[in-house]
């Protein structure tokens, strides 16, 4: 009975010692958090292993992440994974659709993104571009003649319109001279004519009488204006003037209208500020609705695919520029010892318990062996 009690005692003591030793060893990985002193002498094994080697641990963790976890090969493989690409495209389509179907105005969205000043900048930029384009256009066309500047189709239209213009002018002239105003004007012209020709013509005028002269001249003037020959004559005159105009430089226009006035007139007609304001007052949905399907079905998938392809080709350069090892090192270095302990324990809690239990098991087995040795020795 005493033998079995001795074996039980040695086994129990071995298990307790083994379990406690392993438990103490695990605790000594983290504790104490700070070095302890007796007088001027530092107590051995203080601070614990991890607090003591925290800086080295941070460096090694950074290297481990870069060299073994977030490797260019691993990330590149993930980026080219078909399922990953499909999932990312679907996510991007959903997120982009939320943005382009927003009922808020563009102005409100710009204000939310703290870029409300874009309205003023856009107006100024558009006006600047229009001004530069007009000035460049005028600089180029001022070196041409009208014949060179105007398209061939315009030449044809003008030349075809000349006979119609002649007919219109003569028609309006006939209508004018048939009116009382025209007759009165013709009468005044006759009076002025006779007045400028001296006494003899005045005598003829007095003899014939002014009214009779007007009455005789008016039908003849109207008859003259209505003749085909008159129309042809006016057409020929206009045609000659048109030919002269075609040979003249466009730059002569600057004599009558300055460039700045042309630019100012066009900008006033375009109303850039008002146009930009109206555009920004529209909702995002209104602006994007016509191209919504194209954006979702074509633009987004193509953009994501190209982005992933570029990322896969440049992943090593990206990782190098991110300096991940330094980031991990800096983050771990900022952890308090308590947080670092909690982090490690949260990951290895079960395994560390098993190590404690294993120590107790081994201690118990050693106790059994000791008890058997004592039994045989007796």
Curated annotation (Swiss-Prot):
Keyword Transmembrane helix: yes
GO cellular component: plasma membrane
Keyword Zinc-finger: no
Transmembrane segments annotated in the record for this chain: 1-21, 357-377
Keyword list, A-Z: Cell membrane, Membrane, Transmembrane, Transmembrane helix
UniProt family annotation: Belongs to the UPF0754 family.
UniProt name for this protein: UPF0754 membrane protein BCE33L0760
């Amino acid at each position: 009975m005493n033998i079995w009690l001795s074996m039980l005692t040695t086994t129990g003591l071995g298990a307790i010692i083994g379990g406690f030793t392993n438990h103490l060893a695990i605790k000594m990985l983290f504790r104490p958090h700070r070095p302890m002193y007796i007088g001027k002498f530092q107590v051995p094994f203080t601070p614990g292993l991890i607090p003591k080697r925290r800086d080295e641990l941070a460096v090694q963790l950074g290297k481990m992440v870069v060299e073994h976890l977030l490797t260019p090969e691993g990330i590149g493989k993930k980026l080219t994974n078909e399922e990953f690409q499909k999932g990312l495209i679907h996510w991007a389509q959903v997120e982009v659709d939320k943005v382009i179907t927003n009922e808020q105005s563009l102005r409100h969205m710009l204000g939310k993104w703290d870029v409300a000043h874009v309205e003023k900048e856009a107006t100024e930029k558009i006006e600047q571009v229009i001004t530069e384009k007009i000035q460049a256009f005028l600089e180029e066309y001022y070196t041409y003649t009208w014949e060179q500047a105007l398209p061939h189709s315009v030449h044809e239209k003008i030349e075809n319109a000349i006979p119609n213009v002649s007919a219109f002018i003569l028609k309006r002239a006939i209508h004018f001279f048939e009116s009382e105003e025209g007759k009165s004007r013709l009468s005044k012209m006759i009076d002025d004519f006779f007045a400028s020709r001296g006494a003899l013509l005045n005598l003829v005028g007095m003899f014939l009488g002014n009214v009779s002269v007007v009455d005789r001249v008016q039908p003849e003037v109207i008859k003259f204006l209505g003749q085909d020959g008159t129309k042809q004559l006016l057409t020929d005159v206009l045609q000659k003037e048109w030919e002269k105009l075609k040979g003249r430089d466009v730059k002569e226009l600057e004599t009558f209208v300055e460039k700045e006035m042309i630019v100012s007139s066009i900008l006033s007609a375009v109303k850039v500020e008002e146009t930009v304001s109206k555009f920004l007052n529209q909702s995002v949905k209104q602006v994007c609705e016509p191209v919504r399907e194209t954006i979702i079905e074509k633009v987004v998938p193509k953009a994501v695919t190209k982005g992933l392809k570029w990322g896969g080709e440049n992943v090593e350069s990206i990782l190098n520029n991110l300096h991940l090892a330094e980031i991990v090192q800096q983050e771990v270095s900022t952890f308090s010892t308590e947080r670092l302990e909690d982090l490690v324990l949260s990951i290895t809690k079960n395994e560390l318990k098993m190590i404690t239990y294993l120590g107790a098991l081994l201690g118990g087995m050693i106790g059994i062996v000791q008890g058997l040795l004592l039994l045989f020795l007796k």
